[in-house]
Amino acid sequence: GFKHLMATFESARIQTAARATGVAQSALELGLGYARERIQFARPIVEFPRVAGKLAWMAVETMVARQLAYFAGREKDSDRRCDIEAGMAKLLAARVAWSNADNALQIHGGNGYALEYPISRVLCDARILNIFEGAAEIQAHVIARGLLAGRN
């Protein structure tokens, strides 16, 4: 019973991590696309250091979240206990999705709030990822409990 339930949580959290990574990637692509198209002071805003820096960090964090989700998935596929790894993947990917959506919205400026721009929907999608399949605080608790038990 309980072991089966925990295995279900592992799978669900890995799936949520994958979904969150997709949302993070979408936010990155939307931010990059808009930054290439938006002209300010006679040049695309992607050429401005702050915008380029945001995009670079979005790409780095998305890659890290993706790799952690892949790692947790491999552990699960190998029938190894991976509640800590699944929790880490879900926690990180959800935070990266939210951060990327927020940064992409910032790149869009006021246009990001307009429903014509998909980033407004991505922002909503990103927010819920920190809540379902265990809130971020629950994920942190699961991870800490595992670390204290010596499972790292």
Model-inferred region functions:
Residues 4-152:
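Alpha-helical interface subdomain recognition
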